[in-house]
Amino acid sequence: MISDLSAEIIIIGKEILNGFRRDCNVESIARWLLKNGFSLDKVQIIGDIDKDIAEALKLTKARLIFVTGGIGTTRDDRTRFVIADAFKRKLRLSKESVVCLSEKLRKRNVFFTNRYRELCKFPESALRLDNPRGLAEAFILSVKSRAFIVLPGVPFEIESILALPSFNENIRHFFSTKKCEGHILGLVGLRESEIEDICLDIPEFQRGKVSLLPSPGLVYLILQNKKLLPLLKKRFGNYIFTYSGENLEQVVIELLKRQNKTCSVAESCTGGMLGEVLTSVSGASQVFNGGLIVYQNEIKIKELGVSSNTLKNFGAVSKITAKEMACCVRKKMKSDWGIAITGIAGPSGGSKEKPVGTVFIAVSGNKQNKVIKNIFSGDRNIVRISAVRFALNLLRRMILETVK
């Protein structure tokens, strides 16, 4: 049984290295590593040059190495060839891969050409991995006591591969180990400093055995010792929205599904971000009825049904307007819950009474309504993200109150 469950990630792609495209894969892989008991020690981003890829491969020290990108059909997709050469393995054509890829191409009305034939070649002794949402199959290559997992660079393809039960089984087979789960607690509504203050007397926090990963509106706690879970649950209660690293929007969608409830949204300063976040979750159509982006007052009146007197007397950024927006969208879209966001995201538009970052967030249910005023700090995007996450959490907590 291997005790050193260290891991590294090598990101290949000059478009990422040059800043033309943002990497979206490290987070997904890092979450998988933690949930399966691995420790991520290093991340490298390199271009598509053969010698740079080979050097990066040979310098790795971890037991598990993820390599993403460069296994497609273009000329600069060189990863499989460089890996085979670096570890002195011949590339072999997989007949099974040819059959699988031919069927995928047939469904897309695409001919199987020599270009696609290259996707079916793997280093000797490599284990093929299915790619449910793409053409290029991933593979695992064992080199002495280490395993190289070679994945495509497309984020949604990587996520689909990591979610396969067979993927986890293959990794555990390579390491001859039982599943060793880490824990990712998600806390919403508390700042990083507040969490640290609450946990000052816990030895694991003092010794740096718990990592805090803050982002706008929420903080993730990463811990390996599950014995801490009862204590943290007692201290943080409903501030915890996940014990296994899910996104807040995933938790909200699943909660709505379990309660057989629906929601709809009315957004001003967030410009559709709340609706986008909710609909990014698979299965959201079961519980999300729709949303309206109502920037101008006349649209709030005409399309949503907000009272003109409310807007005239209290303004668009107000507690009363937010409440009406939530109630109106709930009734208009025949939902169980209506969520509304109205505010000043900046950088202009603020005043002494309502500075930039002022946001009113309302949730309306059949029997209860809540409106909360916030003043978020940060740039325009941070304010909008913070508002969306606050709205999701307010909905989550109100749903939980109804099932007590």
Q: What is each of the regions a protein language model found here?
A:
Residues 14-15, 70-73, 153-156, 218, ...:
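Short glycine-rich anion-binding loops that position phosphate/pyrophosphate groups of nucleotides
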Residues 67-93, 236-245:
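Flexible gly/pro-rich beta->alpha loop and the following alpha-helix that scaffold active-site loops
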Residues 143-228:
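An accessory alpha-helical subdomain
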